[in-house]
Amino acid sequence: MQKLIDWVDARLPVVTAYEKHMSKYYAPKNFNFMYFFGSLSMLVLVNQLLTGIWLTMSYNPSAEGAFASIEYIMRDVEYGWLLRYLHSTGASAFFVVVYLHMFRGLMYGSYQKPRELVWIFGMTIYLVLMAEAFMGYLLPWGQMSYWGAQVIINLFGAIPVVGEDLSLWIRGDYLISGVTLNRFFALHVVALPIVLLALVVLHLLALHEVGSNNPDGVDIKKNKDENGIPKDGIPFHPYYTVHDIVAVVVFLFVFCAVVFFFPEMGGYALEKPNFEPANPLKTPEHIAPVWYFTPYYAMLRAVTVGILGLPAKFWGVVVMGAAIAILFVLPWLDRSPVKSIRYKGWISKVSLIAFAVSFVVLGYLGAVPSTPGKTTLAQILTFIYFAFFILMPWYSRIDKTKPVPERVTG
């Protein structure tokens, strides 16, 4: 067996890659529970890919057959109901773990030098994940799927000069139709998963090149023993692979509880209107995107005044796009001499809490019908969201920091 392994490794460096990225990749020994979510996102990605493949086998990507094929999967395909619930719940779980993964990066400065590229790859994954979720949202061909996609695609029409042509190009028709469904199906099932997997590989390669951050924001490569091994590092395998099994068990317990007992999640994962087939002549009472898009939808609706002769709808789209785009430049906005929130001053801590609260409340506001009071609150929270980033070069520089230890703490 060893000869076979050596023969393969001489031609395809499997063992070398395993050692570099697992058994001889030294990670900081003080990881806490916030570092579970990267591994959990990989687990959910595998779930989405596998369940997606099996669902595709019975799905009919046509306006005439899409809704009926979903009902067929739910009623007649053996364990089809389980596959669908695993996939729909997995989509929400994916965004839960990704948002927590991103928040951990914000807390511990995982975007700062030398991990700028790791952060950019991660944000690109987030962007592709949003596109993947949006494309997949149309596929059930229910009322909310149809009208939600209609609203989002029509937003591109607010762009001056090219807006209408861009909307037409995305739809492939003058209205959302079977043509739109077919191209969204192709993108959701083939194109975007390939891009997503490639970005995940790049994200991990970039991470393992510069090394993992830790709750203290200390570079463990600066303290090595006589063998060149970081004193505060432990091999990722077997220590953190076993460590992550605990998180996987807890996660699967909660995940399966949702799948088997609350798969609709009160209408947040599977909306009530989506149990009706798409009807272009009947508009739902309230159109809202899936919960993981609602913070940006709330920002879009918060803009109620046109500027420079351009309508409020256009500026809402600009604000929504800027809310995502500004995350990409975060590594160059933070001027703090320390990485971790543990050693930053009160201004940075209050700012991060205000940012997190504003994002969560915006998520709620985007999911409910708009009222004048809620619109005003959304405007205030949108201001707080952007202030966190725009003012960061100033408050991160003047904030009083604590001394950072030379080695990691417990």
Could you tell me what each predicted segment is?
Residues 1-93, 97-410:
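Membrane-embedded and interfacial regions of multi-pass energy-transducing membrane proteins
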